[in-house]
Each structure stands twice: as structure tokens, then as C-alpha cells.
Design a protein with these regions (language model features):
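N-terminal acidic leader/helix
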Residues: 3-32
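Acidic, low-complexity, intrinsically disordered interaction modules
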Residues: 22-84
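Short acidic DE-rich linear segments
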Residues: 89-92
Length: 92
């Protein structure tokens, strides 16, 4: 299983994940992969940067760089990502 992060460079940036070649907008797919509830995921994501929720997921409403978002994500979800790595998953 592979999980990658990319960030669109539009007015508002979406964090988009590729989970097993399926692109998802920060929705239940990624929270399921991380093994946490969608509500917990969204609450913890708010620790990373300013966000607001849409039915499609979380839109970043912040001036931080794409790289900083990815780094903050890795720090916030470090314990979950360690578990994923143990199961052969990579976060790019």
C-alpha cells in the first residue's frame, strides 16, 4: 500500500492523498487507512494549519508552504504512520 501527499496550487489548496492509486480528498478513505475516525482526523488536521471542511474533505486556508504542510502532517500523525510503515506502507 502506498500513501502519497500532493498539494494543488490553486487559491485554496487541497491536501490530496493517493491510497492504493485512488485519489481521495482527506475523507474517510484516509482516516480509515490511518485507523482513526473521520472526526478525530479532521480535529487533528486542524493542528496542522488553518482549514475548513467541505463535503469533499478539508481545504487548507493558510499561507504555509506545501512542504511545511507535509512536514506538519508527518509530525502530527507520526504514530499512525509508523504503524503504516510496519505494514509496508510508505508516505511520500
Amino acid at each position: 500500500m502506498e500513501i502519497s501527499i500532493s498539494v494543488s496550487n490553486k487559491r485554496n489548496r487541497y491536501i490530496i492523498f493517493n491510497v492504493n492509486d485512488n485519489w481521495v480528498f482527506c475523507d474517510e478513505s484516509i482516516s480509515t487507512v490511518l485507523g482513526i475516525s473521520l472526526l478525530e482526523y479532521k480535529q487533528r488536521f486542524k493542528n496542522i494549519c488553518k482549514v475548513f471542511d467541505t463535503k469533499y474533505g478539508i481545504i487548507i486556508n493558510d499561507k504555509i508552504s506545501d512542504e511545511e504542510v507535509v512536514e506538519r502532517f508527518k509530525q502530527e500523525f507520526a504514530s499512525e504512520l509508523v504503524i503504516l510503515k510496519m505494514e509496508g506502507c510508505e508516505l511520500i
